[in-house]
Amino acid sequence: MKIDTSNFKKGLSKRLTIGREATKEYQSYFIPIDQLFFNDQNGRIATYIEEDGGEARGCLEVGNFDEYNDIIAGYIKASANDNGDSFKKTKEDIKSKGQRIPGVILDDGRIIDGNRRFSCIRELKKETGDPKFEYFECVVLPSPKTKNEAQEIKLLELNIQFNDDEKKDYNRIDFLASFYNDTRNTASPNCIDKITYCRAAGRKPAKYDDNKRVVETRLDYLEWIGKPKAFSYLKKDKLDGPLEDIAGGRKKMSQEEWNEKKNTIYSYRTFNGQGDRTRNIRAVIKDAKQDGSIYQSVNQVIENPDFLQNLPNALKIKDKKPTTPEETEERTSYLKKLQDTLDRAFIKGSKEQSAKQYREGPKNILDSVLDKIKNIHPIELRNLPEGSKNEILKQIERIEGKLEARKKACDDDLA
């Protein structure tokens, strides 16, 4: 069904930049909300559709927009970063003042801009029955017929997204799902290159590279646990923060180092459930780069042939939902043994690291002092005023006295 704007009342105009055209005003129209639906090609919404096991997709395929929109609206509200505060504020604003900012849709009913406003209007219609909430004010654009036209719509969506407060309640996983579809998913007709994305989104290349690294790490981890591209799993298991930390550690390693050490890092993150999990995984990641005591101790457990052999089964057990009390007890007991083993390895490595720091502490301090002294050039000292030279000589004498006492302490122990 194609929306014919000649049948509907005109609204405000909205400034848009589409493709290579100059920014200009586009006329908006009041379109019935029952003819509109959330854009299933949007990365964030595609994640929700993946999550629900096909119910939303089934509704969309048979044209049941109302039920489809109910499902997606529920996901949008549930995943907001601010516990729904922005949604409530927008809803109250529209209730008292009406919709003041037009959205953007395609002529097949897909919403390109205005998801929150559309959701609020739908709720207000159900709650009040007021006819004024039967319409969504929006610019209506032609649906793309070519890959180039599809990319122009995607660039418009990005441009609006990064200049619109409505999008700031996106959680990080939803944003990165969109980023993946926009920049890494070559199967998508909307996939665009780095330069084009940065220009449309107003983002610096360094930020693009950081997002790319995090997305690649998430995809790699999902592949590792046997759930390729299942972004919804990351949300369910609250893995947004830990995988950001892991991606940050990956940035400091060569590809060869990363390939060698990622199994230990992924395994520890997946099965460790003891203590301060965030602090501990950060310690393992940091230590991995230096081949330190913590990493080596954890790695020794994970690279043990028995652990490696049981890893696929352990991943299945962790992911499987128990259906009986016996299965629950068995699963809990199995995972607890793994957690205890990893926890003991972490504690052992931490103690070894502390002992090493204690042993090497004095030497590290002296190394630091020596480096600082090397930065004082003799020529600088020769050119100082007489008074300054005398002060420095006194300082040197005090330092020599302190060093002599430390040297004597070492000599006494060695005697």
Feature map (PLM): residue ranges:
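Short, charged/polar connector segments at secondary-structure boundaries
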Residues: M1-K132
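An acidic, glycine-rich, mixed-charge low-complexity segment common to nucleic-acid enzymes
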Residues: M1-K14, Q27, Y208, I373-I376, ...
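Amphipathic, charge-rich alpha-helical segments that serve as recognition/docking helices
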Residues: A78-S79, K126, K132-I225
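Short active-site loop/helix that positions an aromatic residue
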Residues: R116-P131, R279-Q296, E303-P305
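Amphipathic alpha-helical "recognition" segments
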Residues: G129-F136, G202-D287
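C-terminal intrinsically disordered extensions
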Residues: N190-D240, A288-Q339
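Residue-level detector of alpha-helical secondary structure
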Residues: L243, A247, K262, P312, ...
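Charged/polar low-complexity intrinsically disordered segments, enriched in acidic residues
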Residues: N313-I396
